[in-house]
């Protein structure tokens, strides 16, 4: 998340986390492996039975922060895996036994514990909006930089999110007619309520704040973004 790890180190971190910590039945990534002993001299976490709270549970806050860091570094598929597993676990009522939402953690049986106690839900939403859909502010301007996977687009090859920016309701809709995966598409065209927005040569989109604040607040405005395949000569993921 701080940007310290090099790309190869990130790959190794993901490989290790998947090998030692990922448990789909429990809801995703555990905090640690089972040390098979009680270690009270190492603090609070080892005072719990394995699979509960800080000792090896699937801790929602840490998972969402891990996903956020992966997205920031361009590892969208790996970040999506972390978020989607949490969602699927929470939505599986027969196992999680909770109302819709993100609990503090999932225990060894995959049951959601301490509902509404965690900040993970806000981290989850922030990551989905600002990283997955790539809708975020920068020095007051509205920037678009999606990291959506091919399978996240619907039957119309569309993926959309509703946000409020500078008090203005906005729907951002991405159109991916080629159903390209992240890293294989680029932004080709952007329209704000049918008015075309300029795209910089490096294909980054930044809508000035004054253009947004001039919009009416009493209706939802629409930003349509067309994604097209990156030319084969430069078809590589940019981290």
Locations of the language-model features?
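An alpha-helical repeat/solenoid feature that recognizes helix-turn-helix modules
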Residues: 1-6, 59
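Catalytic-domain carbohydrate-binding cleft regions of carbohydrate-active enzymes
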Residues: 31
């Amino acid at each position: 998340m701080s940007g310290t790890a090099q790309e190869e180190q990130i790959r190794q971190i993901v490989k290790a986390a998947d090998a030692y910590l990922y448990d789909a039945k429990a809801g995703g990534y555990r905090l640690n492996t089972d040390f098979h002993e009680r270690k009270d001299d190492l603090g609070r976490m080892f005072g719990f039975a394995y699979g509960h709270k800080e000792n090896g549970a699937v801790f929602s806050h840490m998972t969402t922060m891990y996903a956020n860091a992966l997205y920031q570094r361009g590892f969208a598929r790996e970040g999506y895996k972390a978020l989607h597993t949490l969602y699927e676990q929470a939505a599986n009522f027969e196992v999680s036994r909770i109302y819709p939402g993100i609990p503090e953690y999932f225990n060894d049986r995959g049951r959601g514990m301490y509902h509404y106690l965690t900040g993970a839900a806000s981290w989850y939403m922030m990551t989905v909006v600002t990283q997955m859909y790539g809708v975020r502010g920068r020095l007051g301007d509205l920037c678009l930089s999606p990291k959506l996977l091919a399978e996240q687009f619907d039957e119309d090859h569309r993926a959309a999110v509703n946000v409020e920016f500078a008090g203005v309701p906005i729907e951002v809709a991405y159109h991916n007619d080629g159903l390209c995966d992240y890293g294989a598409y680029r932004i080709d065209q952007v329209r704000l309520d049918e008015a075309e927005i300029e795209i910089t040569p490096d294909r980054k989109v930044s809508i000035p704040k004054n253009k947004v604040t001039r919009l009416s607040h009493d209706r939802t405005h629409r930003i349509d973004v067309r994604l097209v395949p990156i030319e084969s000569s430069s078809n590589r993921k940019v981290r």
